[in-house]
Amino acid sequence: MKTKAIFVIAAAAMVFSLASCEKIGPDEKPDGGDGSTSDTTVVSPGPSAGSDTLSGNVSGVWESGRTIFVDGHIVVPEGKSLTIEEGVTVIFSDAGVGVNHAAVEFSVNGNLYCLGTEEAPVRLTVAEELRTAANTFEGLWGGIVAGATCEEMLIDHTIIEYCGGQVIEGSPAAENGYYTAGDDAYPHITTNNVDGRYVITNSILRNGWSDAIYMMGGNAIIAGNIFSAIGYDGAEAVNVKSGCTVDVTRNIMFSANTNGLKLSSSDQSEVRHQAKIQAYNNTIIGSGWRRDGEKGGGIYVEENADAGVFNNLLVNCKFRATTPAWDEPGSEDCYDGEHSMIDYNYYASGTVESSIVFSGEYEDDGEMLLYSGVKFPYEGYAFNHEWYDAEKVDVHSVMARTAEEAASLDPKFVNFDLNMDPASYAFNDSWDFHLAAGSPALDASKTYTAGDRQPYFGTSGLEVNGQTYTSPAIGAWFGAFGE
């Protein structure tokens, strides 16, 4: 067995790795997964132009360096695979499909392998002239919808952007029962197979109306990614439901509208098992401020989710970890407080007032309530929120609750100033979220490393596309990176 490490230096000179074991032998399928070579779409260089326009069923290989224009829904059929090689740019039409202009959807009923590299990432995007700040939350195309028959998917060194078109009548996701027409918008990535295997790593998911990753089933490693400008009027960077077992680690989550992490076991049943999540060593920045009301803030755990949430570094978030109905154990809305461990996190705050502050009264289901009026992150951490489980959650966490504590607990990023508008969603590629020497967030004595909460896929890993990927080990520091 051949062993290799996958490294990334993304955006702000950030480095991480995932170990993988490449399987060499007669079972390896060089065509990308299903072993067949007939009835496929193989895009190869032509004599004149380095581009192609496609819609409908797609499979085979989109070869390195090509530009693919997509002007209608595309589908990887069940039993087929599509491999997108390094340097491929896929441009989705913003015109939509049909008389109702349904957002273009990338449906994956078979398997998908996006195999970018640090030097030549795969890019799923829109036309260059549409890649503007004004279109950050416009939802110009749909997103990837991995259906119930998608067995595996690898998203590696891939940029996915400007997603989030509305799901309407005629949208494949509505016709297939994954989303509701008129009520939902497309995430960047959706999963639906409780037995599926998904690895999303070294990638950038940005600029979208809805969630970045919405998991309704599957086993996943989500590691080493950058999420930024996620959600127009709601949404999370990573949203996990029942039927999922997931490791979420070493990610940067910047300006998720509501939360960096929403962990729920909603719709749990005999065929959709309890959601199990290990979320550790992530850096979550500026979550919750753009969400109307008091729901957003960074971490949200509900509805019987079994969650390990630890060694995360939350910076300039509106609130700390919230667990609705925490005082009603066993109720439908309460998280699995008996087995979960949401603790040993680090809450840092700048001292700049948010440009978005909700104060005064508001109506919720006919009831008049008061906004928190929180202006600074440290005020939100100190706020007497009804969803703070003071008995079990963040008991050992490090937390800035005053301006003075905010100054003393500055995590000292190599290149990121805490004293910026916490509601900002513009990501700067020069930022570096490594911790400088002497950072209090490097204090290993305050972290969690040796307990029962270990990565689900840290040893056995997940086999995808003939390789076994393992989750990174728990870091003895807070956040995605140490020094």
Question: What are the language-model segments listed below?
Answer:
Residues 1-7, 22:
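Positively charged n-region of N-terminal signal peptides that target proteins for export
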Residues 17-20:
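C-terminal motif of bacterial Sec signal peptides marking the signal peptidase cleavage site
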Residues 25-85, 93-110, 116-117, 121-483:
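Extracellular beta-rich repeat passengers
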